[in-house]
């Protein structure tokens, strides 16, 4: 697998050079996995003022993997199709490219026989290390993984036949070549701005409806924190109809992750890939990139540690923000007043967190507005553009603050170590000392046995959620078929999505062929692009965060995902937990179909969608309060 290094703006002589796709993955590849560990000196800190007041520093490690089930499809709009061809190699269902700080490997089917491992699991410290009590009883099947081990040597030639490395630790022990040369002087965002401008993919700026390209308002627009030499490491890929990208600035202490799970074609996901990252950056300029000083999280002195952590969780359903749709007629008024629904009675999120969440919502709303404006120009020739859509999951981490935005059924699941609960033990009157000791021991044993807790940070916008069904039916009282057979109008399982205009405006439905039309009653939208937003403050109990498209949860519960990552990383702390999850998904899909995984992987793309979906997974590890990589 190549990397397209010389073709990427981070390494080319032209700072505004368009990004070009890397060489395609090997023909026998089913997807890709990748890892990223910050340099040993990198610390994701807060503002200087807060850093001086606290010795806590955030470190993280990132693991990702994606597998495709759907074949590659062509975009409907010529400009979309051109961008698709510029970005992704033709006739490939999956591809990946990145800056050189990411270690990556294709998912290639492992050759039998596979030797079984034996012996008990032992908790081991490392990048992704936290043994879970319930996970320790799970199947020890690491050696039965359906894919080959090893990482690509990114220092080798950029051909798709680059040699496999036996261990990720070997790569990380080499000099970090990405910290030198032109990679420190170029920014991925500039290439996206440039390509978007050429292909009329611009996002209208605030207060302006634009049918043409949206150029940066200043030379610094589109560059991180207005610095001409922002050091940004990045990765991007596709798997069937899924798209994802990751951007990391160690210098300024932030991470951006976007996962876009498309349906009915690639136009919406490719548009999101080209535009949402740029739009988020523009909206956050002056809010986060300029790093407003001296703003700390409001925390009350609460007696219960679990409750104290809950005060760092704030939730805002962004109706009316940035001109988007509305679930609640009072939502815009509430948003203007800055009201935030919290998990505990607290003073509310600080203004900076509220502003970041609003900025994310505005970026998404304006990106969808621009998407429909561009699609409108080709609606007569390509009415099927009214069908295409995508789920959206965005994570932005700045220091210890994690901001999440989701539309659809992709998930962000947090793994957290629960604190032992002694409050019902120590405060009993006339407690016998021996009995007290016994109950303390039982609580500690239960704590170890229960292992990690899983917390789903993003709500699910699908017809499986009763509150979403009630919302849609309340908005369409005269339509008894608003939600039928677990789908909106019998067509779409998600209740919120980017695009999918045929369920938002009657005109898009009217343009479709009769076979694709729905019985659109009235003028109100059936689905919306109103995102759910959440801010979470990383605590000493938080271990890792799993971001993924919904295909992962076709075969896993939230708890099973957390336990699988914990079990795998306890045994293989230098391993790739996201790749392990993909391998376990293939094993479960094959078992359900009554076949072995080799036979499943031989099924062509398209037909394989009957067994599993496209899946994109990002696992981020925060090893406690102060976490350092083992490098």
Curated annotation (Swiss-Prot):
Name the needed cofactors: Mg(2+); Mn(2+)
Q: Which residues form the signal peptide?
A: none
Compositional bias (Polar residues): 131-140
Report which reactions are catalysed by this protein: O-phospho-L-seryl-[protein] + H2O = L-seryl-[protein] + phosphate; O-phospho-L-threonyl-[protein] + H2O = L-threonyl-[protein] + phosphate
Q: Which GO terms describe its biological process?
A: signal transduction
The free-text cofactor remark is: Binds 2 magnesium or manganese ions per subunit.
Q: What is this protein called?
A: Probable protein phosphatase 2C 31
Q: Which domain of life is it from?
A: Eukaryota
Organism of this sequence: Oryza sativa subsp. japonica (Rice)
- Give the start-end ranges of region Disordered: 119-142, 205-231, 324-347
Q: What is its EC number?
A: 3.1.3.16
The family database entries (Pfam families) matched by this protein are listed as: PP2C
> Binding of Mn(2+) 1: at which residues?
261-262
What family is it from?
Answer: Belongs to the PP2C family.
The top EC class, named as a word, is: hydrolase
* Keywords, in A-Z order: Hydrolase, Magnesium, Manganese, Metal-binding, Protein phosphatase
* MF (Gene Ontology): metal ion binding; protein serine/threonine phosphatase activity
Q: Where do the PPM-type phosphatase domain residues begin and end? A: 221-622
Residues that bind Mn(2+) 2, according to the entry?
261, 550, 613
Task: Tell whether Manganese is among the UniProt keywords.
Answer: yes
């Amino acid at each position: 697998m190549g990397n397209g290094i010389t073709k990427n703006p981070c390494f080319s002589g032209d700072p505004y050079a368009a990004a070009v796709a890397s060489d395609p993955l090997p023909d026998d590849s089913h997807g890709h996995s990748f890892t990223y560990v910050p340099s040993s000196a990198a610390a994701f800190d807060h503002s200087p003022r807060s850093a001086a007041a606290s010795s806590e520093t955030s470190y993280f490690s990132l693991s990702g993997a994606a597998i495709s089930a759907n074949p590659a499809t062509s975009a409907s709009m010529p400009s979309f199709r051109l961008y698709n061809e510029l970005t992704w190699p033709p006739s490939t269902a999956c591809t990946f490219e990145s800056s050189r700080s990411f270690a990556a490997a294709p998912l290639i089917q492992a050759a039998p026989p596979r030797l079984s491992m034996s012996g008990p699991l032992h908790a081991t410290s490392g990048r992704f290390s936290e043994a879970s009590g319930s996970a320790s009883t799970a199947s020890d099947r690491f050696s039965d993984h359906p894919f080959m081990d090893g990482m690509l040597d990114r220092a080798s030639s950029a051909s798709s036949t680059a040699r496999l490395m036996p261990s990720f630790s070997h790569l990380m022990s080499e000099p970090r070549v990405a910290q030198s040369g032109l990679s420190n002087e170029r920014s991925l965002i500039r290439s996206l701005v440039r390509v978007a401008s050429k292909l009329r993919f611009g996002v209208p700026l605030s207060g302006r409806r634009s049918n043409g390209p949206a150029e940066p308002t200043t030379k610094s627009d589109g560059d991180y924190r207005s610095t001409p030499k922002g050091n940004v490491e990045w990765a991007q890929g596709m798997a069937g109809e899924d798209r994802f990208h990751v951007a990391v600035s160690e210098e300024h202490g932030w991470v951006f992750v976007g996962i876009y799970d498309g349906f009915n074609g690639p136009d919406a996901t490719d548009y999101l890939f080209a535009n949402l990252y740029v739009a988020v950056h523009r909206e956050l300029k002056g809010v986060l990139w300029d790093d407003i000083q001296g703003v700390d999280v409001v925390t009350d002195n609460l007696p219960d540690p679990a409750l104290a952590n809950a005060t760092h969780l704030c939730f805002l359903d962004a109706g009316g923000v940035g001109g988007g749709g509305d679930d609640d007629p009072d939502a815009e008024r509430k948003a203007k007043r800055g009201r935030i629904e919290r998990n505990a009675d607290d003073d509310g999120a600080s203004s900076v967190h509220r502003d970041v969440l609003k900025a994310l919502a505005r970026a998404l709303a304006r990106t969808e507005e621009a998407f429909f404006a561009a699609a409108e120009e080709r609606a007569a020739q390509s009415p099927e553009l009214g069908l295409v859509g995508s789920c959206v999951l965005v994570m932005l981490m700045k220091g210890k603050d994690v901001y999440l935005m989701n539309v659809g059924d992709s998930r962000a699941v947090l793994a957290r170590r629960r604190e032992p609960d002694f409050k019902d033990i120590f405060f009993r009157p006339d407690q016998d000392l021996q009995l007290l000791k016994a109950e303390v021991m039982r609580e500690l044993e239960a704590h170890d046995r229960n292992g990690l807790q899983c917390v789903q940070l993003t709500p699910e916008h699908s017809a499986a959620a009763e509150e979403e069904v009630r919302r849609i039916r309340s908005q369409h009282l005269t339509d008894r078929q608003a939600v039928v057979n677990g789908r909106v109008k019998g067509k779409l399982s998600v209740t919120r999505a980017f695009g999918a205009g045929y369920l938002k405006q009657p005109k898009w439905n009217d343009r479709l062929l009769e076979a694709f039309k729905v019985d659109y009653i009235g003028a109100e939208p059936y689905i919306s692009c109103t995102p759910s937003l959440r801010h979470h403050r990383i605590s000493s109990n938080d271990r890792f965060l799993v971001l993924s498209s919904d295909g992962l949860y076709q075969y896993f519960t939230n708890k099973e995902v957390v336990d699988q990552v914990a079990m795998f990383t306890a045994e293989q702390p230098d391993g790739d937990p996201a790749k392990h999850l993909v391998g376990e998904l293939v094993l479960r899909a094959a078992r359900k179909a009554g076949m072995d995984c080799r036979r499943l992987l031989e099924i062509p793309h398209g037909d394989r969608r009957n067994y599993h979906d496209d899946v994109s997974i990002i696992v981020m590890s925060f090893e406690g309060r102060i976490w350092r990589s083992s490098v």
